[in-house]
Amino acid sequence: MKKSFFTSSALALVAALALSACGGTANSAGTPAGSASSGINANCPGGEIKFGIEPYEDPAKLTPAYDVLATALSKKLNCPVKVQVVEDYSAEVLAMRNGKLDLGEFGPLGFVFASQKAGAEPLVSFATSDKKLSSYSAGIWVAKDSPLKTIADLKGKSLALGSVGSTSGDVLPRFGLRGVGIADADLKMDYTGGHPEALLALKNGKVDAAEINTQTLATATGAGTFNPSDYRRIWTSAPIPNDPITVRPDADPAFKKAVKDAFLTLDPADIAKVGAFLDVTPPGPMIAVSKDDYQPLFDLAKTMNLTEKNL
């Protein structure tokens, strides 16, 4: 079920996404009666399922949302699911490679390196209400009264970016700039540590422009902390397929199938809080994905000579 999110021209534009990954806040959701402690449960290796989440938003906000999803998943699998929002994008790849995670949600480019370095296998992703693979876009915004009209005007200016290696918060914006002849050294890039922080830097007048992707835009607008009418978007990327949820490669095939089936049969209501952070509102049931759905990201990483060191 390969999706054509990237036209040939869009692929060239998108040819510079960057990775995503993991970090540190852990929480165990759901300890169903009759889990692994009551006997052998092939769906419950080690007595719990460790589920890593990339830190694309404040962990204090992400954890409760993923706990809802994890609780529903734990009931279907009869096994507690432990949610861990990792500290940074590279940490999740390392955690899966070292066998510290059973499942991991990676950013699109992060999945490239999770696949190559940890053998992560994609299971599902987030679907729209019409049951299609959802997507999001990177963007660069300026204040409404800014004299900057296009990204070509950013030469010599300051730009707030998210985390190093972020698909939409780092690599895509820099690739867009490169496309108009602006090298990294031609402007001041401020890595703020995350998407919300980049938005805040623009809002507080600390930079001339900031990366704001459609997910962060939806979250901040919904929370009433950002008014888009006070700002302008001067650049946007091609659509990016949303994050895949992956499984460790050495998991038992029966476990992989059980987890995939459980995700696919989750009620959209159990996905809704996570979907809101991913700009998938309202969400549909989760949808099966394969490596083919993210092939443009693999092509991009190769074209840009990106490695896991770019995380």
Predicted regions located by residue number:
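A local structural motif
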Residues: 75-84, 100, 178-192, 228-230, ...
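Short beta-strand->loop
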Residues: 121-132, 187-188, 222-239
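A bilobed periplasmic-binding-protein/Venus flytrap-type ligand-binding module shared by bacterial periplasmic
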Residues: 137-148, 240-254
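An extracytoplasmic/periplasmic, membrane-proximal ligand-sensing/linker region
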Residues: 39-52, 57-64, 68, 240, ...
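Beta->alpha turn/N-cap motifs
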Residues: 53-55, 85-89, 99-118, 126-127, ...
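Bacterial Sec-type N-terminal signal peptides, specifically the leucine/valine-rich hydrophobic h-region
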Residues: 14-19
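Bacterial lipoprotein signal-peptidase II cleavage site
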Residues: 21-33
